[in-house]
Regions:
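Globin-like tetrapyrrole-binding proteins
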Residues: 14-151
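Sec-dependent signal peptide recognition
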Residues: 1-3
């Protein structure tokens, strides 16, 4: 199984609302979409680059390569990109497995997970700002409990 199978466009269909309404105005919705983590990171080009660099490196690293045996790397990359896109507000659909289901038999150790995260962080640092990197890592961090299945 893959080490990390790592995401709904903010609605801009709201019409202007009453000043005391809880619903955002059209202008507020557009501003929210423009300010999404997805957009601040650089959108799909950045996400695709980071995911590709990370998976290429960890799938060929002797410490983690066993986790990628028999995995179709292009499909994995596509799935991880979709998941990150959705989680960051990019409007992509993610229809892949849950982290728990996709990693339950993989026997991923804490050391393997930490190596993956280190490579991912390095790639994020090369392609996005610290604020965005940290926001994304905070979103993804809870997945560790579903990915790490052995010590």
């Amino acid at each position: 199984m893959a080490l990390f199978t790592l995401f709904s466009l903010l609605g801009c269909s709201q019409l202007a609302t009453k000043p005391n309404s809880d619903k955002p105005s059209l202008e507020q919705s557009k501003a929210s979409a423009e300010d999404s983590l997805f957009n601040r990171m650089g959108g799909l080009p950045t996400i695709k680059t980071v995911v590709s660099e990370t998976i290429d490196e960890v799938s060929s690293n002797r410490k983690t390569s066993r986790s990628f045996k028999d995995i179709k790397l292009p499909k994995l990359k596509e799935s991880v990109v979709s998941q990150i896109c959705k989680l960051t507000g990019g409007g992509c659909e993610y229809d892949g497995e849950t982290m728990l289901n996709s990693h339950k038999d993989a026997k991923i150790s804490t050391a393997e997970f930490e190596l993956f995260v280190a490579v991912f962080r390095e790639s994020l640092s090369r392609h996005t700002n610290t604020r965005e990197k940290n926001e994304l890592l905070k979103i993804l961090a809870p997945m560790k409990r579903d990915i790490v299945t052995t010590q």
